[in-house]
Structures are given as C-alpha cells and as structure tokens.
C-alpha cells in the first residue's frame, strides 16, 4: 500500500492540472504560434513558467486504484500488476486468464 500522503499529492496535482488546463493551453498555443511576435512568445513563455509546477499534466502519476502503487500499472484496467493478477485468478476480469502453452 502506498503512503496516503503520496496518493493525496497526486490527487492535488490532478486538481491543479484541471484548474489551469485552459490557461496553460492558451499560453502554449501562443508560444508555438507562427503569427505571434518574438516579444509575445517570450511573454507567454514567462507566464507559462510562472504557473504552478504541479499544474503540468506530465507530473501526474498513474497509480493502482486499489493499492496506490505507482509502478507496474496497467492503464487499461487501472490496476497494478499484483492486484490485476489477484483479480484475474478470482475471475473478476472478464476475458482475461492466465497464459498456458
């Protein structure tokens, strides 16, 4: 089980990313625009850098829904490898079974 402080930190990052998503997208559009002047691009890049660091979506971590484990998470199921294996062995995941050849 992951520390609750780490899980809560990720939840906080998700909220910040949603809050600043539109503002961040608008500034990125200006920075990558061909029509914007050099000064406008520098100004937009400075404003983008002043946004909270945790508002960037790339700082979010995929975590297991059950255990909160940060690594070995299958995004298709939202579960870590250990919990996915346990669920598969119980037959809770339809269409998924242990390989045998």
From Swiss-Prot:
Molecular function (GO) terms for this protein are:
rRNA binding; structural constituent of ribosome
Enumerate the InterPro entries for this protein.
Ribosomal_uS14, Ribosomal_uS14_bac/plastid
Q: Which Pfam families match?
A: Ribosomal_S14
- Mind listing the UniProt keywords for this protein, alphabetically? Ribonucleoprotein, Ribosomal protein, RNA-binding, rRNA-binding
Question: SUPFAM superfamilies, from UniProt?
Answer: Glucocorticoid receptor-like (DNA-binding domain)
Would the keyword Cell membrane be found if you checked this record's keyword annotation?
Answer: no
- GO biological process, alphabetically ordered: translation
What this protein is called in its record is Small ribosomal subunit protein uS14
Name the species this protein comes from. Answer: Stenotrophomonas maltophilia (strain K279a)
Give the lineage. Bacteria, Pseudomonadati, Pseudomonadota, Gammaproteobacteria, Lysobacterales
């Amino acid at each position: 089980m992951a520390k609750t402080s780490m899980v809560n930190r990720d939840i906080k990052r998700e909220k910040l990313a949603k809050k600043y998503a539109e503002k961040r997208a608008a500034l990125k559009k200006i920075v990558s625009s061909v029509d914007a002047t050099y000064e406008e691009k520098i100004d937009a890049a400075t404003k983008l850098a002043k946004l909270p660091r945790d508002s960037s979506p790339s700082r979010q971590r995929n975590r297991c829904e059950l255990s909160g484990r940060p690594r070995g998470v299958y995004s298709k199921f939202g579960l870590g490898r250990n919990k996915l294996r346990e669920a598969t062995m119980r037959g809770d995941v339809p269409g998924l079974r242990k390989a045998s050849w």
